[in-house]
Amino acid sequence: MKYLILAYGNQQDYDYLGGKDGAAPAATAAEMAAIDEFLVGFTGALAESGELVETQGLTAPVLARRLDLRDGAPVVTDGPFGETEEVIAGYWMVDCASFDRATDIAAGLLTAPGRLSEAGVVVRPVMGAESDV
């Protein structure tokens, strides 16, 4: 069954990872190396087990656009979005034996170094996997 593991973050997390001091100091070179090593290892283990379908990181919220329908016409708003504190920072699509296994995989992200472990992770079954929930 397929599951989408969603990693969350906020603009401050992107600033931290991008080397920009803001509400919190920027990540040091050592912190960035530890984060990179963790993500390469985490994703590599999923690929090696055959459970990884796809993974992608997403750009910062300041680069996003939101579309809403107003008076029958689309209205485009460029980011950042003040009312949105938490955003999807990246995802891993996995194909594994069960919802419990997908949850165990996602829990591994909570052991990430630095700020990565603080924002939280959500696991959602892809349509068709509902019977496993």
Question: Where are the model-predicted features located?
Answer:
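Conserved, structured core segments of small domains
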Residues: 1-133
